[in-house]
Amino acid sequence: MRSNMKQRYLSGDLELLSRIEIQETRSDESSTKVIAEGAASADAFTQLFHKYQLTGSESESLADLGFDSLKLAEFAHDLKETISGEGFDELSSEIDLRLLQKIAMSELFELVQGLNQAAPQAKFRFKSAFQRIHKEFSQLEQEMMRTDAAYDLAMELEWNPSKSSAGGKDIFLTGATGFFGPFLLKSLLEQSNQDLQILVRADAEDTAMERLRQAFETIRPSSELWNLFDQRVRVVLGDLSKSAFGLSPAAWRKLDEEVNCIYHNGAIVNYLLDYESMRAINVDGTNEVLRLAMGKVQKELNHISTTFIFGWSVKDTLYETDQNAEMERLDFGYSQSKWVSEQLVFNAMKHGLKARVFRPALISPSIHGEGYNFDISIRLLAFMLKHGIGTLAQNQVSFTPANLGAHNIVAICQASDSIGLTFHVTRDQYASMGDITQILGQLTGKAFQAFSLKDFVPEVVGRCQKDDLLFPLLNFLVKSVDNISSMEFKLYSNANYRKFRQASPQGVEDPSLSEVVQGILTFMLNHHIVSIEKKI
């Protein structure tokens, strides 16, 4: 069973990748006796396991023992440090967070103890074990993804769109309590007259509404917008990971009959968890949304996906018609689960479901610094600003302010001829990380030392401490550097997005890159992520 902390994390009650404190047991005489059964002192690996309340005899993996992504990152870091400290620096690179979620602690402890005791062939056994686990894990994961992606819910339901009836009038929205969701809710209130039913996980309706209001507050709504919220918004108590969202048959029928449009934005965004850990919400949740979309009443589905479905693609240009059908270069749970989720939507569209797919790249805070976004890009930029380091890498960095992206998504959905299309919600003009740090330097007076990507990552690793927001993502960054380098000149085509945005009376053009970066900086200052002497 996962721990309560894990469950709260998955439900969205915890801030993504917020810091945790690991309580260390004192290594005094009594605790040493527990560790080493009477020995005067414990070896480094035993001490490490004890620090995380592990004995080394557990048959479960860290994930099974309830370690959330933050604690996994802490353990992986400390394990690598211990392995290096014991003189096996070349083996520390074998430590992979995805594998630590799978290996039994008893097996891991036996492997590291072999190193500590200088057992014959210990290094070989260590490397071979991790290579074996990686191979088995990858094969099982690929098989699971292919099976999940091939699932045809419409065929199972024997769904015929011609038999669906008209009648629903409400909009149904998932993921409204995350970062992007409140901006979608705002845009729906502004650009439509329909009532909105919002899926929220909670034990009671008043608790759900309070949680939704707190999320909406992060975008600083006007009094007029709050009035619209009070008049037109109501919550649906439910859980994306459960069949029919956990609703009673009567509640499900009521929802089916009242809704004619769905915006599916709900998902876990996490760069550390593996596919299986994200499957229930990101994949099974999409199936339940599709089950609603293919219900009694005709509905349109607007699916919020991501450009991460392309993984570490090395194609020169990625078009909106591309679907990464061969599942290429997908090696972390978020990209994998969102790819499968998208395939499920495409499967339903082949049977006649009216749907659109939107793929944002990097969603940033609004140009006024609103929202609550602590994703990898914000963490990395805060770290770079703190240390005055940048990179010469030419990878496309496409930041779309959340308010603008949400506004244009809703605007495009008003056009009936946009049904059946996919849209890359990206900036029209190319920009690199160097362009971003140049503007940050102008706004803050901070000087940035630029490194090649090959040298940039070691600089980050050498400077990053456990209290840095970036720390939990270090393993991901190190493991990804070669992939990032290989796709340096990849670009996203957003022809559909530009065409329909420009055709819509509500469509809004990209703000300047300076405005986007200033919004990011304002957010970081407002949330005390960074501090600068020069005011903006």
Which residue stretches match the model-derived regions?
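Phosphopantetheine-dependent thiolation modules in NRPS/PKS and related acyl-activating systems
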Residues: R2-E158
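N-terminal Rossmann/SDR dinucleotide-binding element
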Residues: L65, K127-C261, N265-I268, Y275
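Amphipathic terminal alpha-helices
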Residues: A122-Y151, M155, D170, N193-V200, ...
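Conserved Rossmann-fold NAD(P)-dependent oxidoreductase catalytic core, especially the SDR/UDP-sugar
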Residues: E257, C261-N265, L272-A280, D284-G333, ...
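A conserved pocket-lining segment of Rossmann-fold NAD(P)-dependent short-chain dehydrogenase/reductase
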Residues: D274, S377-L404, N408-I412, S416, ...
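Active-site Tyr-X1-5-Lys
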Residues: E328-R359
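A hydrophobic C-terminal alpha-helical subdomain
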Residues: L392, V457-S504
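Mid/C-terminal beta-alpha module of Rossmann-like enzyme folds, strongest
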Residues: I412-S480, L521-I536
